[in-house]
Amino acid sequence: MGIGQQTDQVATGIIGAMESEIAAIREAMDDVRVSTISGMHFAEGRIAGRLVVVVQCGMGMVNAGICAQTLINGFGVKRIINTGVAGSLTPELTINDFVVSTDAVQHDFDVSPIGFARGEIPYTGMVAFPADKELRAKAVAAVKSAAPASEVLEGRVCSGDQFISTPQQRDAITTAFGGVCAEMEGAAIAQVCHLNGIPYVIIRAISDDSDDMSFEEFQAEAAQECAGAVLAMVRGL
């Protein structure tokens, strides 16, 4: 039984795809207990007295969906924060700026030949899954506190099982969905949270311009910046 099922205090799930995206968050935890489920290591504990479960899900939509559902069913979390890096889809954002999700879409999901809109998840009537307004506000405030020199933009997160590395890919996504950043997990987490009635928010620091030029150079720094913002957010919950 997870910590969120053992107490009346609300437990927060925190998901990052890569070790660099969660390392600083995990290091800030007290009273840590680790469980391994589906090859993922779920660290239960506290940050500034707040109950958290922190996990590296691995890259991609399937990993993210499995992880989010496990946090809900196995650990009883009542809200989920997705942290990490992303590629910018807009000239408004540059390296180490931030995105806080208004909603999230799967940019490579397409069953339009059988009558659904591009990106629409059949039988849900939804293309985009909205983030929680209260968590969004707390996330924006946390970014401004933790990284005052960075810009923070609220907007649509576009997720898919591909690394966006060309202007052609970037333009196709923005034309279809109007998103502000691209990554590989957020929309899966958003869909799982929607189906379970769990509030969520995605916080992403920009590591590249959705090209292949800067990701490796700036990924670690951007991941660290985002982790700092998440820590500030958790301490304010």
Language model: regions and residue ranges:
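Proline-aspartate-enriched helix->loop->beta-strand connector
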Residues: 77-81
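A C-terminal functional module that forms or caps the active site or interfaces directly
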Residues: 161-202, 207-212
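Generic non-transmembrane alpha-helical segments
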Residues: 28, 134-149, 192, 228-236
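Mid-sequence, gly/pro-rich, charge-dense loop/helix-turn segments that line enzyme active sites
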Residues: 89-177
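Alpha-helix C-terminal capping segments
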Residues: 70-74, 92-93, 190-199
